[in-house]
Amino acid sequence: MNKKYVDTIILRLYYGKICKRGGFMSRRKKIVITLILILVLLPAALMGFLYYKINTIKTDNQVEGITNILLLGTDGRKNESAYRSDCMMIVTIDNTHNSIKLTSLARDTYVDIPGVGMGKLNASYFWGKDQLLFKTIKNEFGIEIEKFIQVDFEGLMDVITALGGVDVEISKKEMEAVNKSVPSTYESYDNPDKGEMKLIPGDGVQTLTGYQAISYCRIRDIDSAIYRDARQRKVIMAIASKFKSMPVSSYDDLIKTLSPCVTTNIGTIELLNMAKNSYEILQKGDSIKQGEFPIIDEVHSKGGKYKKAGWVWRYDTNSVVVLKQFIFDDVDMKNNKYLNETDKIKLNG
């Protein structure tokens, strides 16, 4: 690939229009780096260009220690009056242990929402957006988070459509559940490129369209919200995998597609440093470590209707140590010693 073409791509994707007085980076450049963090896996070709530019410009100091970013997937459907946080994941850039982690927080976790009372975790976003959600997470789990990246599901459908679909392995039950909701999702999806409505033909590895993938992310009736969280992580990983296989010439259009549906409070230089750090960690060969909370093992949590909160997950308050040790000490959640100490279980509420 000749240098002139490379420089043109970098200029178009990363610099855009630069303010003469402030010299700050364009929204498009910020969206590129945000996309990288959202997808976690940091596509090699894109990062190759970005890494080259980072090493030729001056950025802030190296990010040290552990950085937690709250990744929010908001689902404000057309027939609903307000947005709710349908997907909550903590993206951890761990420079202490050289690892990247993706931890799902179940939206139905029973928590004490400051100023509101007991309810579901995702209700804190409904009542006070990201700031109240930050407070709730800090009070309940002892994890202080100040940075967030928010993506709405409608926009995520556009990204998957632009990618030509994503490959996801699904079970027969999942396929049947998705096909039940596909017609309504398709009908409400306002995109001229969505094509004719199609159902998923079978189980196994299937290439899902945008509306099929989001229907897949939403299903929960066949199992529980915990499995739903796992499905959401699978789709994110599938998007990342597909993104890596796309030609560099398509990045510009993909970024334009994603841009309207992304919101973040992270500054551009900070995003650059995070992206560079994440890339360096993943270059060492470690894969993304995944976790989820509450711990669903019929011992450290209990699911069901509770008081006036509806269907919730009550969790063992002492099991928060498993979550914190995974994020801060890099201790595998499934092999944490606390899980054997059943005499200390104390359900909240």
Model-identified regions with their sequence ranges:
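Short, Lys/Arg-enriched N-terminal segments with co-localized hydrophobic residues
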Residues: D7-F24
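Entry/capping segment at the start of metal-dependent catalytic domains
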Residues: R27-S99, K276-S278
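Extracytoplasmic
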Residues: E64-T67, Y83-M88, H97-L105, V116, ...
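Second-shell loop/turn segments in exported
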Residues: G76-N79, G119-W127, G142-K147, R218-Y227, ...
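C-terminal solvent-exposed extensions
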Residues: K78, A106-T109, I113, G117, ...
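Flexible, polar/acidic helix-loop-strand segments at domain edges
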Residues: S81, T161-D253
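Soluble non-cytosolic domains of exported or imported proteins
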Residues: S81-R84, G115, S124-L132, Q150-E154, ...
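Amphipathic, coiled-coil-like alpha-helical scaffolding segments used for oligomerization/assembly
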Residues: W127-P192, S245, N265-G267, L271
